[in-house]
Amino acid sequence: MTNTKGKRRGTRYMFSRPFRKHGVVPLATYMRIYRKGDIVDIKGMGTVQKGMPHKCYHGKTGRVYNVTQHAVGIIVNKQVKGKILAKRINVRIEHIKHSKSRDSFLKRVKENDQKKKEAKEKGTWVQLKRQPAPPREAHFVRTNGKEPELLEPIPYEFMA
C-alpha cells in the first residue's frame, strides 16, 4: 500500500484512550488553572478532536505564553533537521497537563531557603549544593567458616 500523508498517520496507539478510561472526559480536566509561564506536558486525547496538537508535539513539554477561554498557547521546541525551533502552538486544555518536571526543583528551593534561615539564626555556614553519593563504608564479608577461593584466569593456549 502507498504511504498516506494524513495528520493522524501512525497514531493508532498514541491517541487511543487507556483501558477503562473511554467515554466522557473527567471534569477535573477542565477545572485545572493554567497561567502564563506554567510548564505543561502535551498529550493528545483521542476523545476530543478539537484543538488537538499535531502528533509531533505528543509527549513534549512546553511553556504557556497565552491563555484563552478554551485553549492555551504553548511554546515548544521542535527539531527540524539540524536546528531546534521554538514553535508556538494553540492547544485545548484537554490535551495538556501540568508538568511534574519542575516539582523536585521547587521543593529543593524551599528546603534550601529553610536551611539558610536556620543557619542565619545560628550564625553558621550550610552546604546547599547537592553532593554525589559517597563510596560505601568498609565492612567485613562473612565466609561462614569457608576458606576464600583464589580465582585465576586460565592461560591462553593456541590450538591450530
Curated annotation (Swiss-Prot):
This is Large ribosomal subunit protein eL21. Belongs to the eukaryotic ribosomal protein eL21 family. GO terms for biological process: translation. InterPro entries: Ribosomal_eL21, Ribosomal_eL21_CS, Ribosomal_eL21_sf, Translation_prot_SH3-like_sf. GO terms for molecular function: structural constituent of ribosome. Component of the large ribosomal subunit. The ribosome is a large ribonucleoprotein complex responsible for the synthesis of proteins in the cell. It comes from the Eukaryota. It comes from Capra hircus (Goat). The keyword Endoplasmic reticulum applies. Residues 112-145 are annotated as: Disordered. Disulfide bonds: none annotated. It is found in: Cytoplasm, Cytosol; Cytoplasm; Endoplasmic reticulum. Pfam families: Ribosomal_L21e. Component of the large ribosomal subunit. Keywords: Cytoplasm, Endoplasmic reticulum, Ribonucleoprotein, Ribosomal protein. One of its GO terms (cellular component) is ribonucleoprotein complex. Residues 112-123, 136-145 have a biased composition (Basic and acidic residues).
